[in-house]
Amino acid sequence: MASTLKSLRALSAPSRVRLLALLNESELTVRELTEITGMRQSGISMHLGQMQEAGLVESSRDGKNAYYRVARDSGAETGLLIELAAAGVAEIPEHASDLVNLKRILERRENQDLVYFNRVAG
């Protein structure tokens, strides 16, 4: 478990708060986060690495994709920090467009899954 101070430091940048709020809604890849936020891939990867080191996010692999999500068993203190970040993200101007873009990405992902399963099921 990461220290509380390390977690607080990780949440000191609005960009990381935006990313954490999105990951609190759904598991996402770096490519999807890039598309949603308009941030550069290298910046997102750096932010995710810092939040992962702080124990705020975790990742899992599915084929060639790494999916990031809010840490599941993060402990009470870290869970509280995640809740506070999710509540405070509304103060960041880009958050409204992030949510619109997130919805679009999730709908596209769902449609791609349906096409795949319909093709496989024949």
Which sequence ranges carry the predicted segments?
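Amphipathic alpha-helical dimerization/coiled-coil segments
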Residues: M1-S3, A76-A121
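N-terminal helix-turn-helix DNA-binding core of bacterial DNA-binding proteins
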Residues: A2-G43, A66-D73
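Conserved strand-loop elements at the edges of beta-sheets that form or border functional pockets
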Residues: A10-A13, Q50, S59-R61
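A structural preference for long, well-packed, hydrophobic secondary-structure segments
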Residues: N24, Q50-E53, V89-A90
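Alpha-helical residues within the helix-turn-helix
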Residues: E35, M46, Q52-E53
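Short amphipathic alpha-helical/adjacent loop interface patches that line ligand
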Residues: T37, L48, A121
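Conserved active-site tyrosine of GNAT-family acetyltransferases
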Residues: M51, Y68, F117
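Beta-hairpin "wing" of winged helix-turn-helix
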Residues: E53-G63, R69-R72
